[in-house]
Amino acid sequence: GLPSLGGEVSPDGTEFWGWEPLAWNDDFTIPYADPNSDQLPTSNDFDRDGDGKPDSWPTGWYNVDLEEYVWPGALRQGSSNSDLEIFFVTDDRTNREFEYYPFPGDSSRKGLGLEIEFRYYQWANPLAEDIIFLIYKVTNKSENDLHEVTFGMWGDPHIGGPSNWQDDLSYFDRNINMVYAWDEDGISDVAGRSPGYFGYKFLESPGQPYDGIDNDNDGMVDESRRNGIGDDGIPTAGDPFDPRQPGEPNFEWTDLDESDMVGLTGFASPPFTSQNRISNDHYVWENHLLAGEFDSANVDQAGDYIFIYSSGPMSLPAGEARRFSIALLVGQDYEDLTLNAITAQDIYEKNYQFAKPPDKPIVMAVPGNEQVTLYWDAEAETSYDLISESYDFEGYVIYRSIEPSFLDQQTITDANGSRFLFEPLKMATAAP
């Protein structure tokens, strides 16, 4: 990947003025990360140094009752919603650029007083293999209400590779809340490999529960995760007197779309110049985060452009949180990208409860005379699927490739002609 060049530092160059990771919550009772590790915590990490703990996890994730380290899942402890999850928390206390003090009792803690919890999800399932889900929970930890907040993302896509930045095109689709980019000449940094399409889709934009408007046109005004109202507009979800007994399965903070979402409200794609870097925050705010403005100039004129897409403005009172979820998408062409966007929306609306394969076995290869013998354990055969509530192992599939990413074996296509599945060398049905 490309290192970031847009972050802001103090005039003496000794401190980042922006978002920095946290190892603990404010009162040091909830661990977020291992301060001795330079890795983000991942759900499938291993214990490489032999201390009994996955290397990127903090020691505070040890559960004394279970006598094991437990992943802090969003919906259940000890389990991730996805095949791979990354979790971390940051805040903006080191942003000392402006004379604003969000914590009157602590003048050293600057920024806006915001904290962000990040969760990134990815599945190995072929339906979702071209999607990464980015979930952000933004909390106003300060003592001040924030009255005009816009949430968004700044990015610099290079479609075709790090050196292939001169001929990018970009556009947006408000109907599906997606912005996207592609390469004009279809030539990448890798000889013989054509670049595809890249996009971001708003699955969940922050909610505005105080304006008296039904922002997402779902029939409920000022919907939020804090008001006790269920998906039918009546505060009875999960209660024994709910006529839909046993009630709504996901409720309040466990229901991802239970908010009055305002949607994608702006998209700018200006040239990558020093003026438009994210460190020039005042200029970016005044010129590129304007609600209702959508830049369409770059659909025909190729160049080196950045992405700035946004949702807002809205209020963020002290102590409250807003959540937004984004799908990072890739596709062979625009049609494939759009199909992936629809798949992402479907997974999101199911609260990320998506089909998962059995756990992977540990495989050992033993070389022989013009042959290799493979041995593996029974981990896959005994894994339990929480979605189907069953042991759903069906068999083993072996793939063989001379290409590191196995792309030469991804020859099975879907109905649209997009490469979809790998062709196995050997299949064996071996249910326990």
Q: Which sequence ranges carry the predicted segments?
A:
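Extracellular/surface-associated beta-sandwich interaction domains
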Residues: 1-432
